[in-house]
Amino acid sequence: MSGFYHKHFLKLLDFTPAELNSLLQLAAKLKADKKSGKEEAKLTGKNIALIFEKDSTRTRCSFEVAAYDQGARVTYLGPSGSQIGHKESIKDTARVLGRMYDGIQYRGYGQEIVETLAEYAGVPVWNGLTNEFHPTQLLADLLTMQEHLPGKAFNEMTLVYAGDARNNMGNSMLEAAALTGLDLRLVAPQACWPEAALVTECRAQAQQNGGNITLTEDVAKGVEGADFIYTDVWVSMGEAKEKWAERIALLRDYQVNSKMMQLTGNPEVKFLHCLPAFHDDQTTLGKKMAEEFGLHGGMEVTDEVFESAASIVFDQAENRMHTIKAVMVATLSKLNN
């Protein structure tokens, strides 16, 4: 793990394929050690700040449990718990927290915010999610894929992302494919494709590593032979209802359902989702979607697929913690370098 100590984790393309692979190997080891009761605390005495301008269940719990497992202490700064960007600049916040903490996690808005924190904090800064990238999620996804296709290299795997690919998930998947050589297919209406410049950059790297990146509106063509089908929510509570109708009309044909799974032609195809998922009407938003748009069986994924044996979403959720732990150990512990 040489080279990781005191390094930031802001986006995947900041790393080499070998570095990404070593992080995944460390995550797998830490997971095995935890389950066997042999985990060694390498972050004893470390203090970690968790800045959340956007709430999250999985990201917060993953960082907190990972830190506690490794002997570190955390301070949670929620959406109303800090003055960042309001009464105090990001630059000043970084310099204050950097004097008190050994590492800082940021989950919030623009990528420029986490980049500024990293520039001025003087300690490792980790991107828990920004509008542009979600690198910790992709680490968990890659570990989960390795676990479910043991013995297969990434450049022998086909990953399909169906839905709105313009977001941080689509961008981070492009970066993951660039580093691993995945056969990545973004199956989405053209209006929901990522920026062309990032696609071009990542496709060139993916091809050098034995993979490819394809963008298509054709569902049947896009999912053929897939090993994994991935999706994410189409709307959020913070958006105007007018956007809900527009987004649902645009993406309705890209819902992950049993027909899409069958179109892969792969009886072993697995379903991935970064969660939370609107697969039923048991949530406030899910109920609204069902009532207003007739999406009673699920929105971006049907309940049938979500609850099927093909669904490995809770393996993914668990792996958030193990991979985040690997990032913290690699960047904060001299014992691991």
Swiss-Prot record:
Location of this chain's protein in the cell: Cytoplasm
Disulfide-bonded cysteines: none
Residues annotated to bind carbamoyl phosphate: 56-59, 83, 107, 134-137, 274-275, 320
One Pfam family in the UniProt entry: OTCace
Keyword tags: Amino-acid biosynthesis, Arginine biosynthesis, Cytoplasm, Transferase
Top-level taxon of origin: Bacteria
InterPro entries in the cross-refs: Asp/Orn_carbamoyltranf_P-bd (IPR006132), Asp/Orn_carbamoylTrfase (IPR006130), Asp/Orn_carbamoylTrfase_sf (IPR036901), Asp_carbamoyltransf_Asp/Orn-bd (IPR006131), Orn/put_carbamltrans (IPR002292), OTCase_ArgI (IPR024904)
EC top class named in words: transferase
Entry's Gene Ontology molecular function annotations: amino acid binding; ornithine carbamoyltransferase activity
Annotated signal peptide: none
SUPFAM superfamilies tied to this protein: Aspartate/ornithine carbamoyltransferase (SSF53671)
Residues reported in the UniProt entry to bind L-ornithine: 168, 232, 236-237
GO biological process: arginine biosynthetic process via ornithine; citrulline biosynthetic process; L-arginine biosynthetic process
Entry EC number(s): 2.1.3.3
Catalysed conversion reaction: carbamoyl phosphate + L-ornithine = L-citrulline + phosphate + H(+)
Entry keyword RNA-binding: no
Any Gene Ontology CC annotation: cytoplasm
Pathway(s) it belongs to: Amino-acid biosynthesis; L-arginine biosynthesis; L-arginine from L-ornithine and carbamoyl phosphate: step 1/3
Record-stated family: Belongs to the aspartate/ornithine carbamoyltransferase superfamily. OTCase family.
Stated role: Reversibly catalyzes the transfer of the carbamoyl group from carbamoyl phosphate (CP) to the N(epsilon) atom of ornithine (ORN) to produce L-citrulline.
Protein name: Ornithine carbamoyltransferase
UniProt organism field: Shigella flexneri serotype 5b (strain 8401)
Name of the encoding gene: argI
